[in-house]
Regions:
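Structured C-terminal helix/loop/strand segments within mature extracytoplasmic catalytic/sensor domains
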Residues: 1-21, 309-385, 649
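Peripheral terminal and inter-domain segments
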Residues: 2, 363-643, 649-657
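A short, well-structured edge-of-sheet supersecondary motif
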Residues: 58-93, 315, 322-326
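Active-site SXXK
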Residues: 82, 99-125, 150, 197-201, ...
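Active-site helix/loop module of the DD-peptidase/beta-lactamase fold
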Residues: 100, 119-155, 176, 207-240
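A small/polar active-site loop signature that marks catalytic segments
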Residues: 155-189, 193-230
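Active-site-proximal alpha-helical segments within enzyme catalytic domains
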Residues: 193-200, 238-261, 313-330
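Active-site Gly/Thr loop motif
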Residues: 273-328
Length: 657
């Protein structure tokens, strides 16, 4: 088994069951070191009726999107004929604020390759080993990998996304991989293919990918606010990590729809537009209604083009209707299997022959202004009205006295939680987090939330009438955050206090729910969106991608019962932490009781960790190929010994439970 797979298993175990030291398996370094600046508006705003599309159609589309519970939309931006006919953002976000694109980044990297091909500096038939002759490789078939194989996800290289947080030498790990299949033989989506494309741009131009694209794409399109995270080798990640605003993405999509031209300036050749949007690989039906081209998706049975990133980031191009749609979401979804995208395609990808009525225009504008308000997790208070408030003789935003019952300082029990969502800290390798204390205080008419995380003190205002924005620095990474709180009472009359942390640059949101009792104890539940459901989708793919890891998951389910993995995921992504009011006489007793409970669980945790650690030791000598290619009879024979090992260890765990 490749060493990066073993480290990935160790990392997953540390996240799932805790660790004795740092959860990270490679050194941490800050990657997101900037926050957004607003992009200027470029496109003309108009009414959809100018293009034969009714406002009623768009109103119905927005209503259906808001009613689809699986859709968690942040921004929506619709172009028709190069003009904006619909634009809306959920409260706290904005179409001119950059947003993490995830795998939509790949499309821009692919365009950079196209520019090199247009320049005559590169051919898609060039072999990778000739571009990087100094890097050794093990598998003889690796010599056959071409630029086209990288573009179309047909390299057969298994070193993939998980390796980004287990290795620092990404290029060496990529080249030293044993291929899953001969290059060009099959389709296997892998973001590291895109990273190597990024390295090719740097190798051939002597420039960073960002600098090259600033000259050839961003500046010509008037895109001034962008950011691309850098990998451990000093090169842009290529396949992910690009931050662009919806309006900027709309420019790129419209340029592509216009045959590679923007404002009469050619950005990409017609030949590259045609070649890069041609199907080069047939993707599994499980990925959706699109096949794969060059770092983008193309309709199986239509001319639609899709730039897609996980969690619901999409640029959808419909040549038939001359439409470009940009949508940012925080959805539990991989690839382009998206209920939100399905709704957009339903309304805007069909033959449109609308009856037009200007009476619908105002209704659409009101819908845009209050988009997704019905889906709020916290609801703002209404600002006070009246002459005295209008004249500013009284504050329109007075303090909500319901928060008075929770004001104070609280120490929290041992945990591995952080204000940043786990999905973000995992991707950024920023895993060494612990919230040690929290406090809530009143400052005039404002509510202030303070917390200590990993020894660093933070303090920010919680909006009660609207989101309050600031920037938080977590170990050198900078995140814009908008915060709002709401005081509620549950069915039993017990106070429940919610604080929502929106990260307008990210698909991810952190929610905190605090519930006190009369004995000085509080419970703090941290949840996030997207949540464990997205990881559950990934885990379901594990048995097909890694036979050994699949066996481990199967044995845990066998011993602890069906649903064990899902329950553990829920605990990881939505932990509940016990805390105590530092001024309460029983505070020390509360924390001692919680410490004993944690210690009782730690023995079980250590045994589970030892199971996985021992299973992945090199001495076991089980290769990926042997685990996945053996016949069913061989599998039965081999697995009996493994089950004996698991039975001896997991039997002890079951007794201790």
């Amino acid at each position: 088994m490749d060493s990066w797979l073993k480290r990935a298993a160790r990392l997953l175990t540390s996240i799932s069951f805790g660790s004795d030291g740092s959860a990270s398996v490679v050194p941490y370094y800050p990657q997101k070191v900037r926050v957004y600046g607003e992009e200027k508006k470029y496109f003309r705003r108009t009414i959809p009726e100018h293009f034969g599309i009714s406002s009623k159609r768009l109103f119905n589309m927005l209503s259906e999107l808001e009613g689809e519970r699986r859709a968690n939309i942040h921004n929506l931006f619709v172009l028709a004929g190069g003009e904006v006919i619909c634009e809306c953002s959920r409260d706290g976000y904005g179409t001119n604020i950059w947003h993490l694109s995830h795998s939509m980044s790949k499309t821009v990297t692919g365009m950079a390759i196209g520019m090199l091909v247009d320049d005559g500096r590169l051919k898609v038939t060039d072999r990778l080993v000739n571009i990087f002759p100094e890097v050794p490789y093990k598998d003889k078939r690796f010599a056959d990998i071409t630029v086209r194989h990288l573009l179309s996800m047909q390299t057969g290289v298994p070193f993939a996304e998980a390796g980004s947080v287990t290795e620092v030498g990404w290029t060496e790990a990529f080249f030293s991989s044993s291929l899953k299949f001969a290059p060009g033989e099959s389709f296997s989506y892998n973001s590291m293919n895109s990273y190597i494309l990024s390295k090719i741009v740097t190798r051939l131009t002597g420039m960073t990918l960002s600098a090259f694209l600033d000259e050839r794409l961003f500046s010509p399109l008037g895109i001034t606010n962008y950011f691309w995270e850098i990998g451990p080798e000093g090169v842009e990640k290529g396949g992910w990590g690009l931050f662009l605003s919806p309006e900027s993405w709309a420019k790129i999509g419209y340029m592509f729809l216009s045959g590679g031209v923007f404002e009469d300036r050619r950005i990409l050749s017609e030949e590259w537009i045609e070649e890069s949007s041609t199907r080069w690989a047939t993707s599994p039906m499980s990925t959706g209604d699109f096949n794969y081209a060059y770092q983008m998706w193309v309709g199986r049975e239509s001319e639609e083009i899709l730039f897609n990133g996980m969690l619901g980031q999409n640029v959808w191009i419909c040549p038939k209707n001359n439409i470009v749609v940009v949508v940012n979401c925080g959805n539990n979804e991989l690839f382009q299997m998206s209920p939100a995208l399905d709704i957009i395609r339903k309304y805007l990808g069909c033959d449109i022959e609308d009856a037009l009525s200007h009476s619908d225009i105002r209704t659409l504008h009101e819908r845009e202004a209050h988009f997704f308000d019905s889906r709020r997790w916290v609801r703002p208070l209404e600002k006070k009205r009246g002459l005295l408030y209008f004249l500013h003789l009284r504050s329109r935003e007075s303090f909500d006295i319901r928060w008075s019952d929770i004001l104070g300082e609280y120490v929290l029990a041992k945990n591995n939680a952080g204000i940043l969502p786990l999905f973000v800290t995992g991707m950024q390798n920023n895993l060494d987090t612990v919230i040690e204390r929290i406090s809530l205080s009143r400052a005039g008419e404002s509510l202030v939330f303070s917390f200590t995380e990993s020894g660093v003190d933070y303090s920010l205002e919680v909006g009660l009438y609207e989101y309050k924005s600031t920037v938080l620095d977590f170990r050198g990474e900078k995140y814009a955050v908008s915060v709002m709180g709401e005081a509620l009472t549950d069915r039993d009359g017990v106070g429940e206090y919610r604080i929502e942390f929106l990260f307008p640059e990210m698909p991810n949101t952190r929610m905190i729910k605090i519930k006190p009792d009369a004995a000085g104890r509080i419970t703090v539940t941290l949840s996030e969106v997207p949540n464990d459901k997205i990881v559950d989708l990934l885990i379901k793919k594990v048995p097909n991608q890694n036979g050994v890891a699949g066996f481990v998951l199967d044995m845990l389910e066998r011993r602890f019962g069906e649903g064990f993995i899902q329950k553990k995921l829920e605990e990881i992504f939505s932990p509940t932490i016990v805390g105590a009011d530092v001024t309460h006489p029983d505070a020390e007793k509360i924390m001692e009781e919680e410490l004993r409970r944690v210690e009782d669980e730690s023995g079980v945790v250590r045994l589970i960790r030892s199971v996985v650690a021992r299973f992945f030791k090199e001495s076991v000598g089980i290769s990926e190929a042997r685990a996945t290619e053996q016949t069913s009879s061989e599998a039965d024979g081999k697995s009996s010994d493994k089950r004996g090992f698991f039975s001896s260890i997991l039997g002890k765990i079951k007794k201790r439970r």
